[in-house]
Amino acid sequence: IYLVLALAVKKKTNARGATEINELVDVADFFNAHIRSELLCENATTSHPVVRADCLKLLTVFRGFVPRDAELQMLPHLAKLLLDSSNVVHSYAANCIEKMMTCRDYSQLQQQQQQLQQQNSTIAASAPVKFAPNDFAPFANDILQNCFNGFELQDSSENEFIAKLIAKTLRYIGGGGSNASGGGKLLANEVIFACCEKLCKRLDEAANNPRNPTYNHFLFEATTACVQCVDFSPNSQEKQRVESALFPTFLGILARDNAEFTPYVFQILALMLESAAVPAAGTGGVAVGISLTEQYLQLLPALLAPHTWDRQANIPALVRLLDAYLKAAPVQIAQLGYLTGVLGVFQKLISSKAHDHQGFYILNAFAKSLDLSVWSEHLPTIWQVLFQRLQSGKTPKFCRGFVVFLSVLVAKRGAEAAVSSMATVQAGIHEMILS
């Protein structure tokens, strides 16, 4: 196996495996003659784990050159290897399946390049995608079930390769991120709900004692894919089931103030709100307001508390979440008296050269989502803060943010409203700004 790996590979990348091979080595024939039988689970009692792991490594490296049908025939056996007692074998199996999902057919590309060279053509060719999500759909349930069972195997309670495969399967086959894969939704809702509940259990365990950042990251990637797999329209039962599974886990993480996990939680909460308040036809891309449930409302006081924003790593995720709140339910937030707290966050961010652009995100959300009559009383204070910063600490980044905010305000609320509000600070100041 090592001899073939050494002789056959001419070009290789970590992301794609072998992209060009030695024509004198018949990789497909070697796979069928020596590798395929080792990977069949019927040989589990006779095959040595080290040999099986090396066979999985070879298949992973040459996945772009092994015949497509041969790889598809191996999928159910690879899924069974996720339950192999050897940590190395089931980790290699998870990595192999994950890499195959986005594999490209480099054998076809190499043939095309040879033909182009013979024709003295300079046309660049690209490798076609080898598999479609439909090819993996019949095995998706087994893959996901065996992945979660694989966490119970020895030394694999936090196996990052298994966690990555779960996330990839939900995105690629389940439709969580179907824009990238072009696959659409090929998993039943009950499968997605079961995955969501199991992921919450894994997150609860990991939050008590975070040890493996890569494993934790892919758990949250998989959780995000679950959210993207289901219908999150306001009255959807799918939305309610996912929220009922996620909120206890998220609230527990926030209550423990887990520094590693809180940015992930804020981002997923923002995604949930953004998915529920999608732009409707005829609104010019403006999200349709929804009524926030008690689960979301009880988070707002903590989000607006000053100490929440003291941790630098939280700020990008918090800004996205606050922006999602303002776009999803601007009227409700204003009626509940939270605008003053939101403006307090804006003032904190705008005073920092590192985070002033985040403050402008919040201002732009104000201008886009809230009627001017709702927050016009706060505009003089906002202008004072901005003008003071322009005078004392102007930077190119701040100036760009200021111009964008002013443009959004004029486009949404009219030039007259913008000029008159600036005049409350100083008459004619808009002329000085423009000049």
Model-assigned labels for residue ranges:
Residues 1-435:
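Karyopherin-beta/Importin-beta family HEAT-repeat alpha-solenoid scaffold
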